[in-house]
Amino acid sequence: MSIVMQLQDVAESTRLGPLSGEVRAGEILHLVGPNGAGKSTLLARMAGMTSGKGSIQFAGQPLEAWSATKLALHRAYLSQQQTPPFAMPVWHYLTLHQHDKTRTELLNDVAGALALDDKLGRSTNQLSGGEWQRVGLAAVVLQITPQANPAGQLLLLDEPMNSLDVAQQSALDKILSALCQQGLAIVMSSHDLNHTLRHAHRAWLLKGGKMLASGRREEVLTPPNLAQAYGMNFRRLDIEGHRMLILTI
């Protein structure tokens, strides 16, 4: 698979790095590790929102060489701290993220998949935390989906499963899997190690801004690696054909 983004000795003050790695088209990459590991800092750097030491190549060009307008066409980014910019109907907010604003059926499909059908006429400042999270997810999906944006290459998500119930998490997994099959590269942070074990193709395990392990999910999420990252003992079990991680006392 082609390399979409390449990081070389990326670092930010004392919070991150230096670390290196590759993001590949058609793969879901999970960033895992304890709080303060540097996951959010790394995602913001990969999104082009911050700068620091080291280099990042995006689609063969230095990330800092991309204009904001061009970057928005090729990558989408959802941070944890996003709040509604000002009051507007949800459908209007979602339309602002579409490069092809005539694709109303696509907007309705994505909204329906994330159970937002009945929220489209509501104002963005009247949403619960979970509803706003789903609106944010719908917005970045509409921004980057190859169905309407052939230039879309990379989707960056900071803890996208926050505030979602089990059904909504499953719906998002289906959307991300479909985007991945269309060739998009997806990088997301996660605190659910078993979710990573089921849904990620590859993982980067971080602690204190350093990369402890990277590679296929099964190679990274091993009890020794996790013990080093979290300071706790883990076991990996096979239950009805599915691998599962549990803490041991």
UniProtKB/Swiss-Prot annotation:
Keyword Transcription regulation included in the entry's annotation: no
Molecular function in Gene Ontology: ABC-type vitamin B12 transporter activity; ATP binding; ATP hydrolysis activity
Pfam families, A to Z: ABC_tran
Reactions performed catalytically: an R-cob(III)alamin(out) + ATP + H2O = an R-cob(III)alamin(in) + ADP + phosphate + H(+)
Topological type in the membrane: Peripheral membrane protein
InterPro entries: AAA+_ATPase, ABC_transporter-like_ATP-bd, ABC_transporter-like_CS, ABC_transptr_BtuD, Metal_Ion_Import_ABC, P-loop_NTPase
Localization per record: Cell inner membrane
GO cellular component term, pick one: plasma membrane
Stretches assigned to the ABC transporter domain: 1-233
Coiled-coil regions listed in the entry: none
Family membership: Belongs to the ABC transporter superfamily. Vitamin B12 importer (TC 3.A.1.13.1) family.
Quaternary state and interactors: The complex is composed of two ATP-binding proteins (BtuD), two transmembrane proteins (BtuC) and a solute-binding protein (BtuF).
NCBIfam families: PRK03695.1
Protein's recorded name: Vitamin B12 import ATP-binding protein BtuD
Organism (species): Shigella boydii serotype 4 (strain Sb227)
Upper classification of the organism: Bacteria, Pseudomonadati, Pseudomonadota, Gammaproteobacteria, Enterobacterales
